[in-house]
Amino acid sequence: ATLSAANDAKNTDGLAARLTGPQLEIHTARIAIAQKTGSVSKFATIPEDIAQTVIPTDSGWPRSVFTITTTTEDQQSKRLLVLTQDSARQNYKLWGVARLFQGAKLPNFAVPKIGSQMGTAKDTGLTMTPQEAVTQYADVLTNGANSQYAANFADDKLRQTIAEQTQNV
């Protein structure tokens, strides 16, 4: 309800109560763009119906919950939501959203009733650490095809949308 109200009013008041980290920055930027263009991007829609949730087994904080949504009413792809809780007495806040394009492959999660251990930004055993992936992808989003990391990532819809919005604003 808070995000819908913010989108409808094109106002960022109250977003920090529900969003944090990169998602707060992204949604704040989307509303700033909407204030200039007159409408919020349809890609800002976050489906409310949940297909799967992975609860953490970690006993400490911060904690993260991973949720996969259903498709939107206008048939946009599912989303992977990452919600974080900084302490036991704070509510979870939406930290990140990733659109899951058709054919996207996710690592296997532990049985949802059991939960999964939280990874770290420096976990190895993947193509690159999560920290390296974020740094490199941010460089690609900033510099497009001129990024030294452009070959490491597919030319996805997010890159195309950001490039298009950058040209329009």
Predicted regions and their residues:
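Surface-exposed, charged secondary-structure patches
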Residues: 34-79, 169
